[in-house]
Amino acid sequence: MVKVGIAACGTTPFTKDDDQIESTLFKSTNNLFENNSKINKKDIDAVLVSTNNNSKYLSPILSEMVGIQPKIAHSIESLCNSGTNSIVSAYSYIASGLAEMILISGAERHDSPGQILQWDNSRGEFKHPIFWASIFTKSYKREFSISDERLAVVSVKNHKQAKENPNAISNNTYTVQDVMNSKKLTDDLKLLDCSRPCTGSASIVLATEELTKSISDDPVWITGIGQKTTSASFTKNKSFTSMESTKAAAQSA
């Protein structure tokens, strides 16, 4: 099996800006190339774009914007699994010999259409992610006797880590009491329990072992990869306290 590494990365700040998706993709890709001068764009065999945005033809557009003429160029959409799907696809292209170096760029806007699923009747009238999250939260709290205070600790930890990330949309820290006192959105989730929709992009380059070593002195090697789809809706879940697909993917990796 061909050894595959993550040789380079680039990102934008995540904001509430109203930038077009094409512009956002370009910014993270440009950041990647600015920070990795050893990459020869002529060596990039494929460009994959990961997004829930409804814009079309994004991969060829991005390729032209950054001066790449790849053999393979296409977009990948699978809601919150889009980024993982892109990495699995790129890994497979390289492992099979169809490509040696691949640029993957993911981007979303604050108004992503992926926030609402009109097709899924199993959710009834509750089509926004806050309601899906609330179903899992209520079930988990009931199953494991989790209090609202203990749940709030997760948000406190996440905001503390975000403050250390210069590209994060949130740069504030909060206490458990702050989270508890924030606006109630559902019976089990408050405003500060939730992540904020934002506009931003990140890009990475995957490559064969030889090319990865020629680009980076400190690459990340993909030593295992796994993926699993159990269903698109909630109806096939064994319970609402865990994600069986996540467990299966981890075991596969």
For the regions a language model picked out, list residue spans one by one.
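Hydrophobic pocket-lining residues that define ligand/cofactor binding sites across diverse proteins
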Residues: 33, 93-94, 212
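Condensing-enzyme catalytic core mediating Claisen C-C bond formation in acyl metabolism
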Residues: 1-19, 23, 152-153, 184-252
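Conserved active-site "lid/cap" helical segment
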Residues: 1-81, 89, 140, 144-147, ...
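Short coil/turn connectors at secondary-structure junctions
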Residues: 1-4, 42-45, 69-72, 96-102, ...
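Short acidic, glycine/serine/threonine-rich loops at helix termini
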Residues: 18-19, 113-118, 163-166, 234-235
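Conserved catalytic cysteine-centered active-site region
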Residues: 51-105, 109-133, 170-194, 223-230, ...
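Conserved thiamine diphosphate
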Residues: 128-170
